[in-house]
Structures are given as structure tokens and as C-alpha cells.
Amino acid sequence: YIAQINEIKSFQANITEDEKKLVSYWSAGAVLRWNEILRELVAKHNLPPYQNADGTYPFPSPNNPLAYPQFPFSNPPYAARAYAYVSAAQYDALVTAWYYKKRFNRAAPYKVDSSLQVLVPTSDLPSYPSEDAVVVGAAVEMLKMLFPGDQDFIQQKAEEHKRVRIISGANVRSDIEAGEALGRAVAQKFVTRARGDRAGAAAGNQAMWTKLETDCTARGETPWYSLELPKRPPMLPAFGKVKTFLFDSLTAVSLRPGPPPSVSSQQMKDETEEIYQMIKNPTRERTAIVHFWADGVATDTPPGHWDEIAAEDFIPKNFSEVRWARNMALLNMSLMDAAIVCWDTKNYYFNPRPTQLNPKIKTLTGIPNFPAYISGHSTFSGAAATILGHIIPERATAYDDMAREASLSRMYGGIHFRSDCEVGLTVGENVGNYAIQRATTDGAE
């Protein structure tokens, strides 16, 4: 132990300005910083593959992640799942760490040796195992699976984070090593779950894509089709079969809403005309809203946007790492389950977009390559606003307002009908309520 204390002294005696900046950066919070890194990776990989010469589209392969198209294509469902797995693994790992902290009750190095500089905020929390290293271990293990082509970058961030905790006087090396090992061990449970959660089959195949169309036609409706040239297969049409976090598969199916208005109904004609009039008469305010909530290609997606909103509100609260992790896990499990219920609904009804029913509608944002009903933005936003309103009740009205604006942005952009958006918000709220049930019964409140 004395040798480990001396290692800190050696680092501090030779500390550079760059190292001081890194200490400041990482001391903002481990869960926060790794969520930012995850959002960065999602944005980097949120790029739909370009077509082959024969008009077909290639699919990214996890077995060859650096070949074009690079794996993953982190579209909204993939991203929602990534945020959920990383957050849930970090939370469970930190809960376990808190047990061992209390059991071993090792004081922080700066409390053992007062000659050490303290370069981070002090606390009475036992230092073994290091909570930061637990977060690192869980993040690295999950991100290796989710972003296999980025392991060098991920490992470099992990080494930087661990080294900073020693330089700062917060932890000795054995605190770090124990924390990282614990984080990795807990995350392995989530890796095993992820490998069997059916996400690997979410892209479907030609037979499935054809059946979605013919089933819709058999109901007397007009099926959705890709408006891209050449036509692109629908985005992850079997994602609705992925294993949920907050409820079982029967509950997921029960959350599927009733059908959209029939394509031949007067209501659908009216809703199509409403979108056409919005597009014909855009305002600067509405156009700004469209772009603010677009969250399209090369962004961290709608779930990432809500993580960003949450993080900004969590920072002033000075939550502990385990509280941060719990909040992010509740939020991101809600967003993943919202994606699952939403994608189940989209591909069950296979309903067309406004531009398909009226080609005169010229959209103000990109047209997503999947069916309209229900709106993904609306479902994500309803779920996020609901659980965030529980976590920070004084912000509940603001979150609801944001969710409504995000939902309306898809109408203003010309890519969704009113029924897509209104029903999507309600479905999202229903999913978010399951997260509240989890929160009120997990013993942490």
C-alpha cells in the first residue's frame, strides 16, 4: 500500500498542465463522461450504407467491423439499445461496488497520507473499489461488443481515466484494478444477455419484408414502401421482437396501439392535407424546431438527444456516481423499450408516410426509411419525459413541453401524420410509466 501511495506522489511531483486538464475533465463524473463518449460513437456510426453497383444494399458485419459498411450502423433502435446496455451495466456494477465499499471501508489515499495533493472534490466514500474504475470496466466491456471497430479509442479513454484517478490522489492502483475487474465481471452478464436478445436478427430478410407488405395489402391498406432510389430494405423491421428491459414480451405486445386511420378514410385525407398545408406555409419558428429535433444521420439520435437533455439537468444536482447511473439506466431502459414497442407497431401496421400519399409534400427534413405509424421521435420523447419528470419533478412540465415539441417537429417537417405523433406520445408515456414502477419499487427512493 505504501508503494501505491508513493506512486501517487511520483505522478504528482511531475504533473503536467495537460494532466491537470485531464483531471478536471474526468472529475466532472464518470457516468457523464462515458455517456458523452458513447454519444460520440453513436454519431460517428449513424451512417446508412451506400448502395452496391447492382442496386442492392450491403449490411454491416460485426465479424468484420472495419470493412465497408462499417459496423455498426447506429440508427435510432441500435443506439437506444446501446445506451440502455451501457447504462444498465454501469448501474448494476456500481450497486455491487457500493456493497464492497461498505464492506472493506478503505479510506481514500489523501485521508491516509495528508501530504498528498487532492486534485478532485473530496468525499467520505470508501475508495475500494474505485467507482470510476467500475464505470470504466463496465463501459469498456459493453462498448467492445457494441462498437468492435473502435476498441483502440475506447481503451485509450479507459487508460486515461484510470491514470487520472491515481494522479489526482483519489485512488491507489489496487482501488482501480479491483474496480475495473468488478465492472467487467458485471458487464459480462449484460454481454451474455445482449447476445441472446434477438437484436442480431432485427434486419430480417427478403421473405419477411415481402410478408409485411402482403399482410398490409390483405387488410385492404396501402403498404409503406421505401422512397429511396434504389429502394432500401426497411430499417430493422424485426426490432420489435428484441427482449425488453422493463417488462416481458407479452406486455410489449399489449402496449401496441390500435390501428392508424385507414388510408382510404376521410380522417387520413384530412391528416394528409394538414401536413401539406404545413409544408406549403412553413414559418421560421417551425423550421427551427424541425432542425433542432431532427437528430438524423451523423447525430447521436433521438435517444442520445434525450440523454444530453438529462445530463444537463443532472449536473447541477451533484448526484453520486451510483445515483447518476441509476437515473441514466432508468432513462435509457425506457428509451430502448420505447424503440421496441414503436418498431413492433410500425412493422405490424406498415403504414405509409405523408409523402407517399401526396407526392407534392416536400419535406423539410430527411424521410426515415421505415413506416410512419407510430412516430419514433414521439414515442422516445413520451417515454423520456415521463421518467425524467419522475426523477426531477420540478422539471416535469418542461419535459412534457419538450416532448410535445419534438413530436410536432415531425409534422412540421412533413414526415409524419398527426395520428402518428399523438399516439406515439401516448405509447411512450405508457412505457415511461413502467420505468416509474421500477423506480418506486427498487429500494433506492
Description of each model-found segment:
Residues 1-445:
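Acidic/polar surface patches and capping/hinge elements
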